[in-house]
């Protein structure tokens, strides 16, 4: 997968998303698909939660575009009716470059090249502390606290919809910016 990314700062795998957009929207031109990917990955927002909400709306509702002077049509990023038509990749140790450090979540689930789920798998030797350690790691990755500034890669979490922390047979989940107590 790293070979398909322009750099480790890029979290969405653009070639996969472009292919999916063209497959799901056969009327779409390659130039329009490339522009949609740029628009999705280059969103301007004042906070992680704002960018996450903008991305969520685009991914779930689609985006209306006008192409070649034709009336507006809605572009789909995913096939919700036939999920098997989507490109699903589950990868481990998905490196993302932050300002000062790389982050490397244990498992990342990508659909059509878009990271949607991040999992942290903790050792049972941590005992009851596994949950706190995993959630703290998510907080650092997202830079949710001043003490984590420049130690994470919040761009990854603009598209991520679910965070899962697991240890053996136990698991908890949350969404972007979820406080510890709600996992």
What does each model-identified segment do?
Residues 1-183:
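An alpha-helical interface "stripe"
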């Amino acid at each position: 997968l790293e070979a398909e990314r322009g750099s480790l700062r890029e979290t969405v795998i653009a070639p996969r998303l472009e292919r999916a957009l063209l497959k799901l929207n056969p009327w779409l031109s390659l130039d329009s698909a490339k522009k949609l990917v740029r628009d999705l990955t280059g969103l301007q927002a004042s906070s992680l939660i704002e960018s996450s909400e903008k991305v969520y709306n685009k991914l779930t509702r689609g985006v209306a575009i006008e192409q070649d002077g034709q009336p507006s049509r809605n572009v789909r990023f995913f096939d919700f009716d036939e999920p098997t038509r989507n490109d699903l990749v589950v990868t481990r140790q998905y490196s993302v470059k932050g300002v000062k450090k790389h982050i490397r979540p244990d498992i990342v689930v990508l659909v059509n090249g878009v990271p949607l789920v991040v999992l942290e798998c903790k050792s049972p030797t941590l005992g009851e502390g596994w949950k706190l350690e995993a959630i703290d790691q998510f907080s650092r990755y997202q830079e949710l606290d001043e003490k984590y500034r420049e130690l994470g890669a919040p761009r990854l979490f603009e598209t991520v919809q679910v965070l899962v922390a697991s240890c053996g047979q136990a698991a908890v989940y949350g969404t972007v910016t979820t406080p510890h107590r709600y996992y």
